[in-house]
A protein has these predicted regions:
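Chalcogenol-based redox active-site neighborhoods
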Residues: 1-155
Length: 155
């Protein structure tokens, strides 16, 4: 079934951003554009290149009125450890959402039940909290921030 125009369910998750832990809720996404960028796990090989690519384009997303949220099933503590130990991930200033309960992954239909990890899913959510663009890639198929930004501009 299509996810287009599906409203994001209420949520409250922990996040790591700019050296701090914080709570992010559905209220935080309403009134502006959002990108939810799901990836399998911290400390993996493809994920750092994708997340760094997003960071390199972050100012353009922000100028377009859009917040980026990366999401994995790792805890916010693991996000901090990865951020502190990886040169690429250490550059990231957008919120890194923790979904250890799998609530967000289930809502966006990207949970790989057998592994307890997320698929590589990219979702653009409008200011009303509805999904208007989505893409889910298999395995090690990486994503491109320029293409995601183009889709945001077209939305």
């Amino acid at each position: 079934m299509s996810m287009i125009n599906k409203e994001v369910s209420d949520f409250s998750v922990q996040a790591y951003q700019n050296g701090e832990f914080k709570t992010v809720t559905k209220e935080d996404i309403l009134g502006k554009w959002s990108v939810f960028f799901f990836y399998p796990a911290d400390f993996t090989f493809v994920c750092p290149t994708e997340l760094e690519d997003l960071q390199n384009k972050y100012a353009e997303f922000q100028a377009a009125g859009c917040e980026i949220f990366s999401v994995s099933t790792d805890s916010h503590f693991v996000h901090k450890a990865w951020h502190d130990s990886s040169e690429r991930i250490g550059k990231i200033i957008y919120p890194m959402l923790a979904d250890p309960t799998h609530a967000l992954c289930k809502d966006f239909e990207v949970l790989i039940e057998a592994d307890g990890m997320a698929e590589r899913g990219s979702f653009i959510v409008n200011p009303e909290g509805k999904i208007v663009v989505y893409e889910v890639n298999a395995g090690n198929v990486g994503r491109n921030a320029d293409e995601l930004f183009r889709r945001l501009q077209a939305s």
